[in-house]
Amino acid sequence: MDNNLIFQDSNDLADLSGYLKRALRLDGAGAVRLRAFGSVLAVYVSPIYAGSLLGDGLTVIGLRTINLASENELDSLFLIEDLLAAAEKSIERDSLTVAPPKTASRVGWAGISPPRQGWVLSGEVEQEKISTWAKDGIAEVAEALPESIGSAIAARVRLQIWGKAVGIEYNFPAGSAFAMAGLGFIQKGVPVKVYRSHGWIRLSTDFGHVIAKESFRFS
């Protein structure tokens, strides 16, 4: 089957491009997983990932779905920058067809499979709280990391900070708030829905979803 992605209109293609640009800002060397289910394209990224092949560390996954003009079967991994370049090329040519670039090497988070079913709505969180938790985490990371610190230590510090629960009432990691804000999934004044399934928590709006395992660590 031809794996070219054919979008319904220019707005959908621009939506993919904008999402990839935001994801690239959060992880300049990051990967994106594309899964096509018929005419629905699921676009996964992971702005925060512990790097464990066992999936036992902090893993925060962003998901946005986009409708396609024709059915497709695809489950592949690409570098974000490569897929973004392909999308931008199609936009420049005024084309709605994107030819996927060469696939990327496997990354551990792409093998982690959050539940696809069994999600139960457990409440809502005000958008203002999500934004505040994201800003507080960014400030804490900046304060904790001197310019001279090594990259490996810096990565551990970031994971420590983003892995902390935002509070007793909402036991999801601060990294989920960071991803919701950074990926453009929140809108001023619009509450974020919270779903739970088998130890996972999903934050959802009309703009996208962020999925992570529950966190009960507060320091």
Describe each PLM feature range:
Residues Q8, R35, I66-A69, E81, ...:
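A structural detector for beta-sheet-dominated domains
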Residues N3-N4, N11, N67, N72, ...:
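Detector for Asparagine
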Residues P47-G62, N171-F178, Y195:
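Short, Lys/Arg-enriched charge-dense amphipathic segments
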Residues S52-I91:
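A broadly used, surface-exposed interaction patch
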